[in-house]
Amino acid sequence: MSSFDFLNELPKELQNKIRNITRALPSSLEVFQELYNYGLSHSDNIEKKRKVTSNGVIDEQNIIFSLKNVSVLSPIRKKLDLVLHLSSIDHKPQLSLVKNGVSEFSISNLKDNVKMGTFLPVPEKPNLLYLFVQLKKVNDKDQDPILLTMNKENVLTEFKSMGLIGQEVDDFNKCTEYIRKQAILTGFKIANPFNPSVEQPVPSFHVECHRGTKEGTLYFLPEIIIFGFKKPILVFESSNIESISYSSITRLTFNVTLIKKVDDGYGTKFEFSMIDQTEYSKIDDYVKLKQVKDESMSEELKAKTANKNKQQNNTSDQPSALQEATKQMETEGNINEIPFDSEDDEEADGNFEDNSDLSDGSEVEEEDNEEENEEDEEADGGDYAEEDFEEDEIIQEQANPAVNQLISKTTPINKNSSNAGLFDFPIETPSFDIPIELEDNEDDEEGSGVEYD
């Protein structure tokens, strides 16, 4: 390792301090190198001081308080006993997770190693309560917190059997108060911000949300915000939150983004999504009480929102069929100049039968051939043509008035035309004969009347 290689393993602030010293006193570099090597060789011992060996048996005479058979979720998942006791080595308080009297995880020097502890409600399970204990960093690395679940009925029964509370007591707050006092005796504090009997300066609450694909609970406490309880569990000091913003607001949900002042390794922005709209007022009141800056209307977010809305509305920017038709009529000037295709594919036009506003000329043709086909229609179900004519009249009456108005504006009206149809403008009808084959025997059997080729 070269002279300054070890500096790259240190925080930048510490690197700068060491470089300033070594510039003034070059011989000190060797001392810093030795100190770094010593720290590496003894880092395992530092961690071991926080834990007892897995086969350490706890003397019952050293137990201050114990809670049997609780569900531990972190740092290990197991049914264990929570025990506050004195160390058999230095007789200082320790917190241990124990199975059959043997410690599987233990924290010593609780006053220095425990950052905070709190009771938290379990959403939709009023008979359960979380105990969350956050540990301080070791070598700038976050440690998994202690998280366990207590069953209120079981704890009440256990406390009564140990004589810690009276048999008539059913208030679980009596149990939490006793546990808090035992924790204070061993060097750390456990908060109970959701205790309804104690007025809080900042009301605590929790909301359901998602972080990415992980569903969890966001707890807003007087001094901290916790997201759990799937790893990594996130803990934010409210004083370390620079600003907050709201986004993706819908009728039912919205998103919240917390922006931290200092990057602690996770990043500075944390977005929580799918929060119920009914929770907005609680979060907004919390933000105002903590004097956190609301960045929802920042220029950056407004630009992102505008860009997102533009992308979502790209399809609406495309001209609709009605707009295309209007443009075509304005360009060509007169609907009579629009070419008619005699081989129009009716099957390809999905709206042909339901939404057609124009006659296909069959009425004119029927008028021209009415006298010639009158006797044939009477012999072969003459009601056919009459019913067809009545259906055309119904369709005309139900035609979209908006389209009628549109066409009347863009097409000159010819009131004197004898061929004026539904919209009172001339329609040039192609003059050609359509051969009609009459097969009396088949028509009588099928009742079809007339066949069109």
Curated annotation (Swiss-Prot):
SUPFAM superfamilies: PH domain-like. It is found in: Nucleus; Chromosome. GO terms for cellular component: chromosome; nucleus. Keywords: Chaperone, Chromosome, DNA-binding, Nucleus, Transcription, Transcription regulation. It comes from the Eukaryota. Pfam families: PH_18, Rtt106_N, Rttp106-like_middle. CDD domains: PH1-like_Rtt106, RTT106_N. GO terms for biological process: DNA replication-dependent chromatin assembly; heterochromatin formation; negative regulation of transcription by RNA polymerase II; transcription elongation by RNA polymerase II. Residues 299-426 are annotated as: Disordered. GO terms for molecular function: double-stranded DNA binding; histone binding; identical protein binding; nucleosome binding. Residues 316-334, 397-420 have a biased composition (Polar residues). Residues 340-395 have a biased composition (Acidic residues). Residues 304-315 have a biased composition (Low complexity). Belongs to the RTT106 family. Histones H3 and H4 chaperone involved in the nucleosome formation and heterochromatin silencing. Required for the deposition of H3K56ac-carrying H3-H4 complex onto newly-replicated DNA. Plays a role in the transcriptional regulation of the cell-cycle dependent histone genes by creating a repressive structure at the core histone gene promoter. Interacts with histones H3 and H4. This is Histone chaperone RTT106. It comes from Candida glabrata (strain ATCC 2001 / BCRC 20586 / JCM 3761 / NBRC 0622 / NRRL Y-65 / CBS 138) (Yeast). The gene is RTT106.
